[in-house]
């Protein structure tokens, strides 16, 4: 049976459990589990990492841990009772683990590695804590390290600041909010402002001395020198070096280094230097022989200095090399370091160029104990400590020092009868009173043990030597008396024996007879003469002699005259036990001189403070001894002396001695009667304060009152102990009288001078320290009443001195911080007076910082859960006194501007935060009773209204993001919890008092506004938190957003008809709330919108306002990243359900649908905008949203905003044409008026005319950059008209020049024609604006199908490319996936006159072929009926699909949606007609190009003629004859009579063209190709005979073929899918011939270039029953065009191999050898004059199997070749230039074709008209549709490596083109030769259906361009002359100006103007 667990609540998994048993819970080792129930060795519970999944697991798998349970029951919370630091470490490391991996993903390597080291360090420290073997101090140290690293990691990762107390996390529920704030602020300030260390230490390590002339041992002496004061400031660090310059004791590294300690900040300045003096030990002269002398002398060697400023920049861990200078003049040795510092080192020599002293220096900061811990490895070896000279800045009690510093300064000696000066050495000894030498009390420096004697260094031949050597004598105090120092002087001989001869001595006693030590300063000692054998061991012989000249001069002047020798030393005593002050000794020995007591007491103030504190206890005993001796006589004097000593301890240097005095009072003070005299004297001083003129002494007394009361209280306690409590009442009366005097003194006002105020301030400063002393004698309530009366006596008038006000407040603050205030009984007495003074200051807004601190302390004492009666009463008092003023104060200080300086800003933030914390503390402590009392305290509704408005405003301020630092989440959550609790209380008051007739809009609006911004706080968005953090917040506070949301809903429902006041104002705020991804909150809040719609419907009959506001806010909110797909669905479903029964349901559904659709588009837009690069999705999504705002919502401002967003996207993607069209949308909204427009987006305030002008110029610029110059010309004309109307001729001139430049660009610059692709987006995973729709996209320059398909797959990486072109079924539409269907389509231009006119250059026509395109199509061949295996063309039909777009391309996007599709089936006969028409047109073009020398060689024409004639001879067109001219077909298809006749006409026309072509070919064919030409002529006659043609009539021969537009025309778009009858098999063939320098072009049979769309189709190749499938292709060329060898044609595949989903692998390799399509190169690099598609040919170089490429090193102009005058032009007067001279070619004109009257094909839903020819840049792709009329002899093509077989069964054709890089064609042709005459062809009619009516486009309409040719006429031979039928047209007219041209019938016709545009809409003031 499962039973709930009592103690087993928490455990850690010690072995992984798979949970394979029923209800098993899968656990991993290390997981923590919470246990709910147990049963027979099993537990039931959950893992803390996933508390939602509960299950069972074996109890043996879990290690139980102690834990405490909070909130027992269903929602119990288990907290482990282990060390809180361990718990925090565990949870923090888990959080870090996830984030640490993310750092690696984000490539933040530095932080990644640093955090890894910190995590490992924390784990190691965690193990140390868990083991539990650490001492208390070590444990504290480890925890400090742990928390420091946890805080560092949290800060680096952007996590929350953790409040801590004693290294443990603090639960905010367990402490007051003010205390929580202080903890947070302390940690935050500690993080931001590191504490500057007050103590510094210098670590010095000696490495070596590098010098070339070593060989003797050395002494190195380090010290710190103050160059400003010219004195050393530290002891010396002494080190011995061996002969190699290395430390002498290598086994003792601690001797190599020292720590110079206790350097204050004042010592860290640039004039403090490290000085190094080096002394050598050896011979007198450095150059003497080694054996010259056996005696060793100390001799000067060198000196080095270093400024300590060089170390202040940071830690110097690298060794420093100090330059060592040698002293040339030994007499200056004592000041060598000073001269080097002063840069006077030129007088010294360096020890060597590479010489130097290698040292390591490091500056350490902090307390010495901290340094010991951090550098324990150094201190563990006993590194020497080098002290400062004298005491530290702070003298610590108990510090024992007795150091006498002796500096051997200088000496004056006589020659002693010698001719040269002496070499003097000084030897020093310390001798005690018995004459014995004291051992080991002479210290040369730290690092060297003390010695018994000292030998000075020797200066060579110097009778006035100066040494300046500092020595320390650490002599014990007990050995000082009677001891003296003896100095012996010896002359050091330089002779071989090296003798030292004693010639004199000096001595100095250490202590004088009166007990004073040797005074500090310089002492000139007498040098007493003596001999070497003089016995100085007997001290009695010389101690009676005078030792100092100063003393001797006073006693015996005559004796002094005998000696001129002297010796000077300087002494300095640093002792805590001995004194040099006689006055101090006199005071301590007062009993021996009673008569001097008064004088001694008076002189006490003159004694140095360090002397007093050294003998503090003795001094105090002396004072109270004198007081006991005669209190009447010495009472006031002793009191003053005591005050002086007390105040001396206030000095920072001596404040550490306060505990010494406290100890004295508690343990050593024995003055039981002293209290009487102390009270009496103190009262005497207080009574005279108001009368005294000088208050300085009185203020000193008041300053000392704390310790005076301590002495009074201790004295009274001693008296009570001694007497059993006698005179208690008397004592109380004395205290009462004293305090009455104080109260009187405090109540007085300062009159005139501020002295009284200063005295009052001094008293108040120290008065709170008295409380604790009074509590030792009086009851708490008594003391509280005394203090209350005293503080109450302060003057409350506001005009008193501000400084006194501040001191008064400080006194209040100290009172609150005192022990007295912590007691509830005394606190209740003191609280009113504290609050009274606080109220006054807050009301005046004075001393806010101090007020905040006091308030914080007040609330720190009130715990959260304290429900004691006294606490409740305190809260009552505080609420009544301070709540209102506290709210006003917060409002006041938060409305002020923040100070600029950082220090003031911190102070400002602190005071604001503390007041906020105080308010929150107060509100958290308030209970229902407090709130009720508060609300009842307002007498009128106006007062209540003001209070509610005030507190709501404050709450809004409190939840501002800047109120607390961003990582203070704990504080924010606590604040929010208090706010929501308070709001719940106050909402009742709102309902009860401000509804119905008392309704107040302002207060309700303030309430709702507060609630909304409360919910929207960033710190409450739990979705952004880590799982562990979210869990903690939910456990402690729940989701406060839902609570507040429910409150909003409840309050809204209470409003009733007053809801109308908040519609539509609250729609936006509420909408923002509902966008928060919290399901419960959304379910609560969304229904409010239904309520708003309902009330708005009641008021106005509609809810337009609601709709408008919803739409406006949705855009801005969703652009901020709010909202998601779930919200859209929830919004839709909830509101639809709500309005089901409403009468206005229909309009409501419409609104909801509109808003939902807008959300769909906004979500798509936001998702797309997250992408990095600009792609089609971004642009398409923006277009969708833009159109939605315009068409469905009519939101003009939003529409314009998105126009500019789209414009920016286009510019970024360099879609300049689309950018121009986009900006044109805004331009159309404006008029040429002077209406002023406001500033909007990037536009300044300007008139509508100016903005429209600016837009025009910008659009023209973009059309220019996009090479859409025709559109730019239209806008140039429009703006020129405006300039002309305003007579602005300057700008008019510029505009006309700009227009002219655009015309030049049309004629001179090349333009690449884009490909067009149809893209289908299927499946539900696509964005809304693409889902299950098809589009036609305009490709980028040079972009082919493969590249486009790859681009689309990159944009949609999860999409699947469909492998067929069939319409997808419904399963694809509804699939939860993305499917892409892509294939190329052919643009069908609108019928425009410019495309059919003669003489219009192709540069002009090319624009209209690919611009303003609404219609596109592609074809699919299929068999209908029985398939004839002998002639498949009988049953081969073509399915032609036409696509109509919603807008023409190009436009505001590179792609537009397909609005309509039409499918037409073309019969086999119609297909045959198209094939022949296009092949004839191709032939005409090639012949024309050859005739006018536009071809670089004749190979293309040769190939084309060969293909057509060969195919015809071998049965080509006979297939058509067999299929359509037989009797059976004619009888069975009587309706096709006209079409059959048309087919026959085309055959005859082809024969005429071929004959004329052969004549031209013969004229230009090179010699090596003559055999081929002869063969073609022979085969042509065979072909004619096969067609039943013998000879053309004479009249037909008389006229040449007339080519309209100057060339034979290939109308690829008129019938692009013509199919020839012999296309059933694909037979690859190779030609054995490869002609160098000869172009080979495909010239397959009757199928033409117009069958381009068939190139997208895969047809049957072997089996006649195969289904023909559509294939993607980047081009739309035909099977047999001159460009049929495109990259998409393979030798074995019947369709494009490019991205072909059905192409087998064996075919795909052929792409590598395919030719480039012409559009892959600049058109002029292929042919000089771009005229017609059939004229664009690609030169393929045949050689080494290399594919042709456009030279990448050539610029576009270099690749282009300009056109030349045509020799076919009837109005040319000059013959064409040779191409080698001019590089220009031009095509002959092409005659117009009459309209055909044939009927369209059957099964046609819509038949498109015959469009103009395709762009010259269009590459051609071999169409699958075979042609029977092209054939090449096997001998020509059977084995050619670059030629492939035709698709005709058994009929070969050239399907690849080969070009050469050079051509000799132009050199072989006579420029004057004329073409051969050919018969005039039969007119070719065209057929087609009606073009559907198109909607108006927003793009500039195409305009007709009639250009009068500038070519000079060239006469033609009579045989080729063509009658003049028309004159070339003039230039295009200006808009609205009628232009006419001569037509063929002689009539004039007016040039049609541009397509009418809609009237511009009125635009708002944008």
Swiss-Prot record:
The keyword Chloroplast does not apply. Changing residue 1755 to P: Found in colorectal cancer cell line. Residues 401-574 form the C2 DOCK-type domain. Residues 1672-1703, 1838-1863 have a biased composition (Low complexity). CDD domains: C2_Dock-B, DHR2_DOCK4, SH3_DOCK4_B. Residues 6-67 form the SH3 domain. One of its GO terms (molecular function) is PDZ domain binding. Residues 1190-1596 form the DOCKER domain. Functions as a guanine nucleotide exchange factor (GEF) that promotes the exchange of GDP to GTP, converting inactive GDP-bound small GTPases into their active GTP-bound form. Involved in regulation of adherens junction between cells. Plays a role in cell migration. This is Dedicator of cytokinesis protein 4. It comes from Homo sapiens. The lineage of its organism: Eukaryota, Metazoa, Chordata, Craniata, Vertebrata. The gene is DOCK4.
